[in-house]
C-alpha cells in the first residue's frame, strides 16, 4: 500500500513543517505611522533564530518598544532618531522623501506604514537615486539592481544590514546545514522521488535509476508531482533562456 508523499504531508501542515514561532522575539517591522517619533534607544542586539541578520531592540522616549534589523556599526546604548527631521546617520529611521540621493538604506517600506518590505537580508542595502516630490514618490535601486518607485511618506533605516558575508562561510558539515534548516522549518535533507521506492513516490521504483519525463498537465491528482508540464529544467534551461533573449 502506498503512503502520502512529502508534499502532501507538508500541505497538511504538521508541527515538523511549521515555523517555530515560540523561538521568535517578535516581528521585525516599524510600528504604525504616528506611533513613534523623536528619539529611541538601542537597549539590546539579539540573535533571532530563522533570520539571517542581528535584530536591534529599540525603545522610544514615549515607551514604545519595537524590533528593527541592526545596521552595521550599531551598538547597545546608541541613540537613534526616528521620523521627520532625522539626520542621515547610520541606524536612524527617516522618512523616504527626506533622505538625500546616494544614501544607503534598508528595511524600506513599499507603502507608508507597511513596516518594511525591501532590503532586509543580512549585508544588503538599497540606494536612493531620485525624488519625485510632486508625485510623492522616491526612486530606489534594490540589491538586485532593479529600480522601483516607493511612497515618499514611507520609512527606511540608514545604513547596511549587519551580518554581511554570511554566505561566504561554507557549511563544511551536513549537521550544520541540518540545524540551519531546522531553525527555518525547512525539510532537510531532500530526497529525489526517483531515488525512492514505488510505495513512497510515483516516480520511485525500478531496477536502475533513469532520467524521468515531465508529468503532463492533464495528469490526475496524485500523479501530478515534480515538474508539471515543464519544457526544460535545471541550469542548462536557465542558460538556454538567456541565450534566446540575446
Curated annotation (Swiss-Prot):
Keywords: Ribonucleoprotein, Ribosomal protein, RNA-binding, rRNA-binding. GO terms for biological process: cytoplasmic translation. One of its GO terms (molecular function) is RNA binding. One of its GO terms (cellular component) is cytosolic large ribosomal subunit. The keyword Cell wall biogenesis/degradation does not apply. Residues 197-227 are annotated as: Disordered. One of the primary rRNA binding proteins. Required for association of the 30S and 50S subunits to form the 70S ribosome, for tRNA binding and peptide bond formation. It has been suggested to have peptidyltransferase activity; this is somewhat controversial. Makes several contacts with the 16S rRNA in the 70S ribosome. Part of the 50S ribosomal subunit. Forms a bridge to the 30S subunit in the 70S ribosome. Belongs to the universal ribosomal protein uL2 family. PANTHER family: LARGE RIBOSOMAL SUBUNIT PROTEIN UL2, RIBOSOMAL PROTEIN L2. This is Large ribosomal subunit protein uL2. It comes from Pyrobaculum aerophilum (strain ATCC 51768 / DSM 7523 / JCM 9630 / CIP 104966 / NBRC 100827 / IM2).
